[in-house]
Amino acid sequence: MEEEDPTASNVITNSNSSSMRNLSPAMNTPVVSLESRINRLINANQSQSPSPSSLSRSIYSDRFIPSRSGSNFALFDLSPSPSKDGKEDGAGSYATLLRAAMFGPETPEKRDITGFSSSRNIFRFKTETHRSLNSFSPFGVDDDSPGVSHSGPVKAPRKVPRSPYKVLDAPALQDDFYLNLVDWSAQNVLAVGLGNCVYLWNACSSKVTKLCDLGAEDSVCSVGWALRGTHLAVGTSTGKVQIWDASRCKRTRTMEGHRLRVGALAWGSSVLSSGSRDKSILQRDIRCQEDHVSKLAGHKSEVCGLKWSYDNRELASGGNDNRLFVWNQHSTQPVLKYSEHTAAVKAIAWSPHVHGLLASGGGTADRCIRFWNTTTNTHLSSIDTCSQVCNLAWSKNVNELVSTHGYSQNQIIVWKYPTMSKIATLTGHTYRVLYLAVSPDGQTIVTGAGDETLRFWNVFPSPKSQNTDSEIGSSFFGRTTIR
């Protein structure tokens, strides 16, 4: 006995249940136009249907059928597929005819839900594979793509404000590549050398204090805060180094030893290093009465960059001889020598995250940032920045660093390490950005240039929350004068 079409039985059951309800005569009237269309389609496909008796029954309806012409029935897998069992052909044919009667003779074409079409497979090397509905991503991102986390939505890149939140006028800020005239203390006080004077700007109160005046015969060439931020070292054009108590605005000591200007200063735990145009580096122990305890010789030209490592065991120095040297605590000769740069090396920065990781930047003829492993004495990588590298500083909160540049864009670039992808490029200075310092909370940088301005930028996130605003300066938006 031939199996009856289950779909037709459902329709008949529907019409019988409708006739037993107390409905108006108008609603029990057969839908003639729909019946006629189905009968015509049945007659045209008589040879394909094995159960014409089940399809010739009158069909009644007790509801309005909505138009679904815009629906993609391929998503519901309603399109007929070849069947091995001939008894299922009747149901498939009936479904085809019913869909054609309700939505027109052209059924929506079944498509690959991934959006891939074989006609578009031109110059593509990746093989497209069928994906089930379970793997379809509602966010427009392939869940199987490399680097996509299945634990949650993809995290948006961190946004860095493209404008400084504060600008200070800094009259007489020198446009000299070999000087270091800006430093930020652990007590949140900014020191700036302007001409023959040093000024202190308190970031919490915005109060400006004149620390010292060297007189007409001398000028400030470098400033550097001690680690605790209570004392400031000042390098002068006459080769002297002065130590000032910032809280009392009182000079506590003057040390000699250099014959020419002192353009670079770096504090260790109890050692102050000074680099000079006379090509030498003097190590000064402030606990001793002597002006210096040792002299480091090796550079063939002016020393313009000095930085102690975070563990105070290694000192990196850069000079106008295009050389980068690394010294230990007790050596008078460099233990490591690097000559890959082709211009003056002023920009030097030790990583606070990886022991022995050193970054250096070259001048106009070089334009490269290079990375070194001083533990294994290896050159790790380099990147051409396409402009003079004036300064480098690592973030202590995240594995990023910032560089400041000269000709031709005078830009500031925030980099992601180790990929060295650019997080942000900041512009605004009209002269090369020669000076850079980082706030004690590690979120803000200040940059200085020959355009006689100091600009404050929020570039690094907080170690606890990337959305937390910097504690300093966020409410002091505007432009003022530092003296």
Curated annotation (Swiss-Prot):
Q: Indicate, by first and last residue, each region the UniProt record lists as having compositional bias (Polar residues).
A: 7-28
Q: Name one Pfam family in it.
A: WD40_CDC20-Fz
Q: Which parts are the WD repeats?
A: 174-211, 215-254, 257-294, 298-337, 340-382, 384-425, 428-467
Concerning SUPFAM superfamilies, the annotation shows:
WD40 repeat-like
Q: Where are the transmembrane segments?
A: none
Sorted alphabetically, the Gene Ontology BP terms of this entry are: cell division; DNA endoreduplication; multidimensional cell growth; protein ubiquitination; trichome branching
Looking up SMART domains in the UniProt record yields: WD40
Localization, per the record, is:
Nucleus
Q: Its annotated pathway?
A: Protein modification; protein ubiquitination
Without the gene, what phenotype results?
A: Reduced endoreduplication and reduced expansion in trichomes and other leaf cells. Longer roots. Root meristem contains more dividing cells with a delayed onset of endoreduplication.
Q: Which UniProt keywords apply?
A: Cell cycle, Cell division, Mitosis, Nucleus, Repeat, Ubl conjugation pathway, WD repeat
Q: Where is this region: Disordered?
A: 1-28
Q: Which GO terms describe its molecular function?
A: anaphase-promoting complex binding; ubiquitin-protein transferase activator activity
Main localization is nucleus
Q: Which GO terms describe its cellular component?
A: nucleus
Tissue localization of expression: Expressed in seedlings, flowers, leaves and roots. Expressed in the differentiating cell files of the root elongation zone.
Describe the function of this protein. Activator protein that regulates the ubiquitin ligase activity and substrate specificity of the anaphase promoting complex/cyclosome (APC/C). Necessary and sufficient for endoreduplication and correct cell expansion. Controls meristem size by stimulating endoreduplication in the elongation zone.
What the record says about family reads: Belongs to the WD repeat CDC20/Fizzy family.
What more does the record tell us?
A: FZR2 controls the induction of early rounds of endoreduplication while the remaining rounds may be mediated by FZR1 and FZR3.
Subunit: Associates with the APC/C complex. Interacts with CDC20-1, CDC20-2, CYCA1-1, CYCA1-2, CYCA3-4, CYCB1-1 and CYCB1-2. Binds to GIG1 and PYM.
What protein is this chain from? Protein FIZZY-RELATED 2
